[in-house]
Amino acid sequence: MKTLLLTFLVVTIVCLDLGYTLICHQLHGLQTCEPAQKFCQKRTTMFFPNHPVLLMGCTYNCPTERYSVCCSTDKCNK
């Protein structure tokens, strides 16, 4: 019985994802961030006049633009 429990414990530890990664919304679905990407962003930018573009996803640092949202919890940039 002890051997079975020990085996189960070892298999569980090996199968677990020991590192935490942030999950952010993209325009279509979710994105799992790289370990160094600590923030989710949602920002609107204009590449051309009167044509706003929405950008969403993981980022290394928070954008400082006027129409931007930056947060650091899972799925916070909806």
From Swiss-Prot:
Keywords noted in UniProt: Acetylcholine receptor inhibiting toxin, Disulfide bond, Ion channel impairing toxin, Neurotoxin, Postsynaptic neurotoxin, Secreted, Signal, Toxin
Site (described: Key residue for inhibition of muscle alpha-1-beta-1-delta-epsilon (CHRNA1-CHRNB1-CHRND-CHRNE) and important for inhibition of neuronal alpha-3-beta-2/CHRNA3-CHRNB2 nAChR): 46
Signal in keyword set: yes
Paired cysteines (S-S): 24-40, 33-58, 62-70, 71-76
InterPro entries linked: Snake_3FTx, Snake_toxin-like_sf, Toxin_cobra-type
Marked site (Important residue for interaction with muscle alpha-1-beta-1-delta-epsilon (CHRNA1-CHRNB1-CHRND-CHRNE) and neuronal alpha-3-beta-2/CHRNA3-CHRNB2 nAChR) residue numbers: 67
GO molecular function: acetylcholine receptor inhibitor activity; ion channel regulator activity; toxin activity
Signal sequence range: 1-21
Site (Important residue for inhibition of muscle alpha-1-beta-1-delta-epsilon (CHRNA1-CHRNB1-CHRND-CHRNE) nAChR): 45, 47
Tissue: Expressed by the venom gland.
Highest taxon in the source lineage: Eukaryota
Annotated family: Belongs to the three-finger toxin family. Short-chain subfamily.
Described function: This three-finger toxin binds and inhibits the nicotinic acetylcholine receptor (nAChR).
Protein name, UniProt field: Short neurotoxin SNTX14
